[in-house]
């Protein structure tokens, strides 16, 4: 079997199948042979496990997953890739390709049908432009997955893994921390890809929590995250100003809620923890 990280192999495959990499799909193939084994190992996949992959490309990471998991299901939106994958994955009978959009496919039904009671890990080299929507769909639907190990743009990785209440945290950091325990594993230089992106990448692992990190008031997650998004919508302002503007509330009401929750009225959005946003949401809705 040809080495899928070899540039000549990639060019030969692309030429024979008349395949041109698509900027629209954010396609950058991995040519560093050491990266994908590290991703697969970091996911903790082994005998008895299932692996769900998003965007297999020509199968570089897929191959490493197939060597470790009982079954690998890869979701691919690019209709041009199945013929290439049929060739590159021909030696693995535990591989299945699903031609669909990961943001539209019924993931709960897919996981139940393909993996049953197996522990499942998600692995992917995610397109930069759609990282957050994919990760949030995987987390928000409370799917039966153990962890998510993905390669993303390093700047996004740092934001995704930033602890709530710290300077680097953004609204997405709070959402990730609510559903999972994130860890930034290692960086990947741009020369590890073909074509080489202009930015550095990084691999992160999200260990999915069995229950969310905090219990939001009335279980209203939509209102809880609307509050956090409003707070971060005007990051340079105080949380009070941003929330009042973002949720169209009187500033006096927000200040009263902050005081009632025992929080600093001058706090910046990133200075509040998940627990403190819960307390604030509760105070805002307590009459």
PLM region spans:
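C-terminal lobe and adjacent flexible extensions of AdoMet/dcAdoMet transferase-like proteins
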Residues: 208, 228-287
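Catalytic cores of RNA-modifying enzymes
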Residues: 1-222, 226-230, 259, 270, ...
């Amino acid at each position: 079997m040809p080495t899928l990280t070899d540039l000549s192999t990639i060019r030969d495959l692309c030429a024979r199948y008349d395949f041109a990499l698509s900027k629209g799909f954010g396609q950058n193939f991995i040519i560093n042979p050491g990266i994908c084994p590290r991703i697969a190992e970091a996911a903790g996949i082994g005998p008895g496990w299932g692996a769900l992959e998003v965007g297999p490309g020509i199968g570089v990471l897929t191959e490493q997953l197939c060597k470790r998991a009982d079954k690998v299901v890869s979701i691919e939106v690019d209709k041009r890739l199945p013929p290439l994958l049929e060739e590159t994955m021909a030696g693995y009978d535990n591989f299945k390709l699903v031609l669909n959009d990961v943001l539209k496919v019924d993931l709960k039904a897919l996981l139940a049908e393909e993996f049953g009671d197996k522990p499942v890990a998600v692995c992917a080299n995610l397109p930069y432009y759609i990282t957050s929507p994919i990760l949030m769909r995987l987390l928000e639907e409370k799917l039966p997955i153990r962890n998510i190990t993905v390669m993303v743009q390093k700047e996004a990785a740092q934001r995704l893994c930033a602890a709530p209440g710290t300077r680097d945290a953004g609204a997405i950091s709070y959402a990730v921390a609510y559903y999972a325990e994130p860890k930034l594993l290692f960086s990947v230089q741009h020369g590890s890809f073909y074509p080489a992106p202009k930015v550095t990448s990084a691999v992160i692992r999200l260990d999915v929590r069995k229950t969310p990190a905090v219990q939001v008031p009335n279980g209203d997650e939509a209102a809880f995250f609307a509050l956090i998004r409003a707070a971060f919508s005007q990051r340079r302002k105080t949380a009070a100003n941003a929330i009042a503007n973002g949720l169209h509330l009187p500033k006096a009401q927000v200040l009263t809620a902050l005081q009632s929750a025992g929080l600093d009225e001058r706090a910046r959005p990133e200075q509040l923890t998940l627990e403190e946003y819960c307390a604030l949401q509760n105070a805002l809705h307590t009459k």
